């Protein structure tokens, strides 16, 4: 600071010396006072500056002291210089900044949505797992690939590439997958089993609508027509590739969780759950046997074997239906064996034995309708056309209910022959005798009266009793079991084979027929080589004469289809040794046959058709037939009753 003590005082004037001296002393005092105050101010200013500069006394300040100015010991002053971690921090930071890299990576443009995911979930997961930052270009510029910028260490960039490749490979179009017309749209078709198409669609289409809303795609179930053909149906999914893939997984999950049995009882077997399936063909009319009354039999098989059994839908034109068994292979095989044993026990109850008695059925081949009482049988009946609706019901509910209650299968023959009466409809009941009786009872309750039985009208050859229209009795001996071959409907006059009038359905008579069948004596050895059906004829007449309360002929050995005469063709002569006279049997047969013949044309009762001409032609054919099959002629039959 300036030293004001060297400043000379101001000079005084010469005039008024004494007074001037007194005035000069007053000025000096004022100057001294001002100088003193200036010094005090300067001292005060200098003291504040010294205090701020000496801020180290308070432990803080605006400027750090050099390490050398510190009052610490020398050992502590040297320690930071020997710290290896501290000395390495700057190089590590510089190395890290040098290792971060940015690389451009191309991905398919159609897979961008799949990579990003809903709400960015997929790309966030990739960045978190790889530690790499991913930036996708907003568009591809019309190119098939889009650029992605990957930023991170070389390891993280490689990890991100690997994850991206996995996602692209997973979302790569599968068979049936193609890009749609719209930008970024894709179409994929997956096959839905026919039995689960309704599950995917839902009631009124609600399920498929919910799937479309949840996945944000469009779904269409493709089928050729409204009829159910039993074939798998393609489900077409259209939308963003990622959403299409999600929708596909949702559909498969729906089928897995709700469409069938989980674990060992998975509905689709190897298609989804890894289980396998077996298809077992079942004769159409035997489906009711496998299902059982109210489904009891099929439930028992499923529970015992631990599988799922379903009948595949079909168009009803094949003679068999396919039972699909799904589950583990060993259990599927076990269930198939159970079903096969069930059918075999019903079919082969008495292999080669007689067919059901009481219906005059004499087939020369084995079939499902042959076997002891309790096996599968068939009963045909006709009802007026006006009462058909009472049996079928609205939407088939009545006939389904009767079938479920009785366990029998009931069918309306929809393709009658041209000569059928248009005012009558033919129904067929198939099942066990008990099931048929119960179904017949339920049907009669529905129509308010008895049904009109109709024997199976298929003509047969010489092996058997006089055809399906003969009097009640066991048919000719059957051969080993043959394929199921239902007889066609033919209500017209019988064919060239010998037939009699229709016989009433009498299932209760079957039990009485078999003892006589088994008790008959073997035929004459001399005739055994020429007539293989002699035993059948013997049983027939034994049963027939027992029903008529007449003694059966002694030692029967032949049938009318073979040489039965005395060698002269004359009924008046006694039969030679070893021959049997069946005159009485034929008389009784034609008496019964005549009772069933319609009235003459002149007065048809109740408008019934007159079959006199048909019966006359039938007798002529019968005579010609026996003349051909019998080398010595046939017995002379009594004249036909009046009106024939």
Swiss-Prot record:
What PROSITE patterns does this protein map onto? KH_TYPE_1
Modification after translation, per record: Ubiquitinated. This targets the protein for proteasome-mediated degradation.
SUPFAM superfamilies the UniProt entry points to:
Eukaryotic type KH-domain (KH-domain type I)
Residues carrying Omega-N-methylarginine:
321, 359, 361, 363
The protein's superkingdom reads Eukaryota
**GO cellular component assignments:** cytoplasm; nucleoplasm; nucleus
Bias (Gly residues): 14-27, 350-365
Region of interest called Disordered, as start-end residue ranges on this chain: 1-31, 44-94, 346-365, 447-532, 548-580
Q: Which residues cross the membrane?
A: none
Q: Where is the composition biased (Pro residues)?
A: 468-505
Entry protein name: Far upstream element-binding protein 1
Supply the gene name. Answer: FUBP1
